[in-house]
């Protein structure tokens, strides 16, 4: 197998492994609040929003220390160990107790930080400046396929149900646990790429990331270097500007992955289909994500205009979705009680409009995330692990804040927060992209990014 084929193989395996893991985890997150609302009528008392706030809060803090972990252990073993904790969290839903539920939330927050730092590093060392855009698109499309498969099962399994029984819950979460474990094992198929033509090849700390037989002294040096780089990159102009864009992706991640499905499941006017519509919503979010990731990955080789048009498309699509959701959903839908809400929206609540908005949310999200992955891999090719750690730190802390306020804020206030951050995040991305065009003058084939 040629070096380029080996790198592409690694990217595909990386994407497929994440597809399995996040088929389980994203489906879990999409239905968690609805499942827990049903559980709250028993001896269990908890909140899916609170669990997600814990996960993303711990995730954000842990991102500060994960570059040294990935530098020492390597991305492959880091992702495998993280996958085990993801599987543990999903398994807790089979017989949840408040203490085990929230404890698992803490552990998966740590695991997520390690997982995503290792993913960014693995993506970068298997790419060069000509393939980073393509590889980002391939990975993103495979990752977001996860939204399709798990939610398709939920749609058919929960058809016509207004409450989730213990049998329904266990059937779903046993299957999701097994799927997560399959994805975890797939990380062992990733091969060490040849050292030539890898992004950041001049940086020894990136070249050797997948080496496992190094001296303890060298490991310590790599850990200290990675830790220092994380703090240095935090205060660079480009990273500060991109952090505004990243903050927006954290807010809208919370909305489409946890809040929007809960809103749909709480609207009594949708009748007996309200619970199965949660699964259908997740499917159409996934279709939007897959379409965006595939399209922008294929077009990246011939995109003479850079990343800005894709991000502009993303924010326009999201603003349309937010406006339709504002009109179509009752304001109290995110915080409705177990029995749901009978409140009226500005227009008659439509299932078709709700599902259309799901698609638009997924498409817009793929616009932002594929371009952020691409520009980070390009600008910070020699410091990939610290750069992606900062990216996930900002994204996750904003997601944690959003999950926290989702317990209290009415829908229109949540939408307003996203509109404000989306507007300024788009402007800040444009600024970095325009400055990045200066790489052309230094001989980099910028159009292929």
Swiss-Prot record:
The chain crosses the membrane at residues 8-28, 53-73, 74-94, 96-116, 138-158, 170-190, 239-259, 277-297, 309-329, 359-379, 385-405, 410-430. CDD domains: MFS_MFSD11. It is found in: Membrane. The keyword Transmembrane applies. Coiled coil: none annotated. Keywords: Glycoprotein, Membrane, Phosphoprotein, Transmembrane, Transmembrane helix. InterPro entries: Ion_channel_UNC-93, MFS_trans_sf, UNC-93-like_regulator. Belongs to the unc-93 family. This is UNC93-like protein MFSD11. It comes from Pongo abelii. The gene is MFSD11.
